[in-house]
Amino acid sequence: MSKSDWKRGASESRQQIELLRARWPKAFPAKGHEVRPLANAAPAIAEALGWSNAYARGVLSPWVLREAYCRAVLAHAMRINLDGSESELTVDDEARAMATARLALIAARKAQEPERKAQEGQN
């Protein structure tokens, strides 16, 4: 995997997610409560859009680290394909553990935010 392709994909994620949302709206919904865990999306996206696998993974990285995606991993047993249909792949315990850890990190950052803003206001 090309690290530079992955980094470029991650940095361009915001605009590329909009492209993915236009092409596969059920896989990349705008509303957080509609998000579902994806089934091996990177290779299919790379093939469909002519991207490298590393670039596609980079684009998807911020998406799967979002709070809404982590919550979806914990709430849904089945993963979905890009067209929104249910995949045969299930959400495994490792994915649930990673989502739980990520949500804890997000919560800790949110808890620190008022303190950080107060400190910035004093400067």
Q: What are the functions of these language-model segments?
A:
Residues 29, 45, 79-80:
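Generic preference for hydrophobic/aromatic residues in regular secondary structure cores
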Residues 1-41:
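Extended alpha-helical interaction segments
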Residues 19, 23, 44, 48, ...:
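Residues that form generic nucleotide/phosphate-binding pockets
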Residues 11, 15, 36, 64, ...:
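Residue-level signal for the start and early helices of compact helical domains
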Residues 5-9, 23, 57, 69-123:
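Basic, alpha-helical nucleic-acid-binding regions used in initiation and control of genome expression
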Residues 45-57, 61-66:
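Compact, well-ordered interaction domains used in eukaryotic information-processing assemblies
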Residues 34, 41, 58-64, 71-72, ...:
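Conserved, aromatic- and glycine-enriched, well-ordered alpha/beta core segments
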